[in-house]
Amino acid sequence: MKETIVAQATPIGRGGVGILRVSGPLAQQVAQEILGKTLTPRLAHYLPFKDNDGEILDQGIALFFKAPNSFTGEDVLELQGHGGQVILDLLLKRILTINGIRIARTGEFSEQAFLNDKLDLAQAEAIADLIDATSEQAARSALKSLQGEFSNKINQLVDQVIYLRTYVEAAIDFPDEEIDFLADGKIERHLNDIIHQLAAVRQEAKQGSILREGMKAVIAGRPNAGKSSLLNALAGREAAIVTNIAGTTRDVLHEHIHLDGMPLHIIDTAGLREASDEVEKIGIQRAWNEIVAADHVLLMLDSTEQSAYAFKTEWAEFLAKLPPKMPITIIRNKVDLSGEVEGLTQLDGFTLIRLSAQTKIGVDVLREHLKTSMGYQSSTEGGFLARRRHLQALETAAKHLTQGHIQLTQFFAGELLAEELRLVQNTLSEITGQFTSDDLLGNIFSSFCIGK
């Protein structure tokens, strides 16, 4: 017999309302034992919740959803009572005294919904993304994914790939036909259409991934260059202590903001120099740990101390230690003191921005540059939200399509084209969960809240 699961659906702790969710074949039995009544599906009942001996534990609203018309596709019971944690724990213990009921694993309700075809894998992930959204744009985009906008685009691509694959395999199976199906141009035209449509979905998915993941920007530089002042200017508040004493910042400071909806994780680090102080050495090592893991490095220079053209020589060792292809922007700070004109220029292959973190002159230029460098495009409408695994799958599918195009146009190798199309179909289907591994499912649902 299939197991019945139960969990608290509201956050742990004190609140106005607390909800317990039960899903599985014993949901009706739970209702009968706790409420003493058979519930009418989809109708709110205001009833007392009783203990084993009939003592009232709480009173609230009970809702019953009959399979398959529920979130999980199973019988579901929701008990909505007062949000005191002691009350909820007592009610949970009471439910667990019924044989055949256990505590749900993290994400198990959503997993059951996926397994019962109530939603696909991309939609299930969107539930977690909607809960974790840190901006209005991210929330709206996650909701679009939950409603199936991303999945629909993927399913349309898969359908076209299946159609083309069928056509190619038919051409292979009937080689004696008078028409050369591989050379008549129809397959290539259809293949090109799929390639172009996939490129459009990849671009939209990239925007969705930026909206979800954001950018990790690390501010690096010598002591007293103005790193903490820049952190405060970008954050719009006094997040870091600022003094004229070099080495004030000895640890890593994190600040999370949004640039037109794009999450930006700004990290202020200890000044980079030869240090004899053991505490400062630890701070510098932590700074390097953040620098090598960054999406973007902001190298902060004091414009009153050195020429703009001297940075490659002065910072040659620093630049050599950066990971290959690490995006780096040179910040010439304190232009209010040096007299330099604020703005963005290109210098020796680097983007250089002149600004004053203290007066905030030129800080808006930096904000726009950070958005542009990530390829983020602000939009009031927004698209769907995407994860890194989605981007990887789309990239892999694009490579197989490109390889398939080569097999068709250069070698007229129908069998190899058909194989590439099969791989495209499987790769795209991993996004929605039509073709996926149990390990992937476990990794995805284990990141959910326990009551979801």
Swiss-Prot record:
Binding note for cofactor: Binds 1 potassium ion per subunit.
Gene Ontology CC terms, in alphabetical order: cytosol
Keyword tags: Cytoplasm, GTP-binding, Hydrolase, Magnesium, Metal-binding, Nucleotide-binding, Potassium, tRNA processing
Residues bound to (6S)-5-formyl-5,6,7,8-tetrahydrofolate: R21, E78, K118, K452
Gene3D superfamilies in the record: P-loop containing nucleotide triphosphate hydrolases, Probable tRNA modification gtpase trme, domain 1, tRNA modification GTPase MnmE domain 2
Start and end residues of each TrmE-type G domain: 214-375
Binding site for K(+): N224, T243, I245, T248
Residues at which Mg(2+) binds: S228, T249
Domain of life of the organism encoding this protein: Bacteria
Family: Belongs to the TRAFAC class TrmE-Era-EngA-EngB-Septin-like GTPase superfamily. TrmE GTPase family.
Protein name as it appears in the record: tRNA modification GTPase MnmE
Species of origin: Haemophilus ducreyi (strain 35000HP / ATCC 700724)
Gene name per UniProt: mnmE
